[in-house]
Each structure stands twice: as C-alpha cells, then as structure tokens.
Amino acid sequence: MIATRDDVCRQAGLQYGWLPHAFQAPRTLRGWLSDRGSLTQRLRSRYRDFRVLPVLRGVAAPFPDESGALGLARDASAYVRDVLLLGDGKARVFAHSVLPRAALRGGWNGIARLGTRPLGEALFRTPRVRRLAMTMRRVDARHPLYCAARRHAEVAERALWARRSVFCLDGHPLLVSEVFLPALLTP
C-alpha cells in the first residue's frame, strides 16, 4: 500500500521512541511539553525580551527518525531551519524544523524567508495549518537532536526533554522539534 501525503501527516511523529505523553518528565517541564498552544506566545509572555536567533537554515539531510516520520526516502534531503529562542538574552529553547523540499513550492513557501521571525507566529495565524501528532521524549548524546542543541547552546546536562509536533498544510507535513534547555526554568 502506498502512503498518501495525508497518511504521512497523520502518522508522523508517532515513532522512534517519541511518546504522546510526558509522564516521566520532571513536573516543572510537563506543562511546557504538553502545551498545544503557541510556544512563541508563551515565551513572549514570560520574558520581556524575546528573540529568535537563526543558527542554521538550508537544504540538508534530515535526522534518520525524521525521514521516517515524514515519509521521506533515507537519502532524501529537506529544508532544515534551526533557531535558538532567546528570553532576556538567554537560550531557552532550541527549535529544529524539517520540511520536505517539495512542500517549499506550496503553502509552506514562506518558511525559507522567515529570518529572525518566529515560525510559531506563522503556524498559529494560518487557519489552514493543522497541528496533528505531538510527541515528546528525553534526548541524549545518542540522538542527533541533542547534539544539535548542544552545538548551539551551552548545555552541561547529559539529557534534555524535547517535544515534536507535526503541522500539516494542504497535505504537506512540517516537523517541528523543540528542545527545552535548562535556562528555561531559571529567571
């Protein structure tokens, strides 16, 4: 059976150790992990100075678990955007977005031009965008998402909690992973 784009949108994210709940997460992080609202809005309301710092953008190979979740071939490339979400000058969240290249020609075509604007604003302002699967897990040095977060932010912890959401627009999935950095829980 050949999967359609809508099938990929429905199934993405529910694999590779990603779970639909955060029961094992520290109590202080559970609300952040499970909140289905805009992370951008939540960070803006918590910090006086909220900014987006782009650290990587362009065509790249998705992480292995992302290719599977998006229904891409293992050797396929995608558009990748990595940013740090800063609150009062400190990196609070590392965000990693992956979009199949074919989707850049459709409704997602503005993603490549976001620059320092938050992706969350575009996602939650567009009525046709649907948030589907939202999963979470603890990532450590064995997971490339942890390594990417550590490369761009000062992280001493051996593991971090992350959540991953699939947003769908016109049948095209966009995978957004957010790694919650230790500074999120500090003033």
UniProtKB/Swiss-Prot annotation:
Principal cellular location given in the protein's record? cytoplasm
Q: Which Gene3D superfamilies did the record assign?
A: Chorismate lyase-like (3.40.1410.10)
SUPFAM superfamilies reported in the protein's UniProt record = Chorismate lyase-like
Give the subcellular location.
Cytoplasm
User: Which is a Gene Ontology cellular component entry for this protein?
Assistant: cytosol
Taking the record's annotation, the residue ranges forming a coiled coil are: none
Pfam families hit by this protein: Chor_lyase
Pathways per UniProt: Cofactor biosynthesis; ubiquinone biosynthesis
Q: Which GO terms describe its biological process?
A: pyruvate biosynthetic process; ubiquinone biosynthetic process
Q: Name one GO molecular function term.
A: chorismate lyase activity
Q: For substrate, which residues are the binding ones?
A: 81, 119, 178
Q: Which UniProt keywords apply?
A: Cytoplasm, Lyase, Pyruvate, Ubiquinone biosynthesis
Q: Which reaction does it catalyse?
A: chorismate = 4-hydroxybenzoate + pyruvate
Q: What's the Enzyme Commission number for this chain?
A: 4.1.3.40
UniProt similarity note: Belongs to the UbiC family.
Function field: Removes the pyruvyl group from chorismate, with concomitant aromatization of the ring, to provide 4-hydroxybenzoate (4HB) for the ubiquinone pathway.
Identify this protein by name.
Probable chorismate pyruvate-lyase
- The scientific name of the source species is Thiobacillus denitrificans (strain ATCC 25259 / T1)
Q: What is the lineage of its organism?
A: Bacteria, Pseudomonadati, Pseudomonadota, Betaproteobacteria, Nitrosomonadales
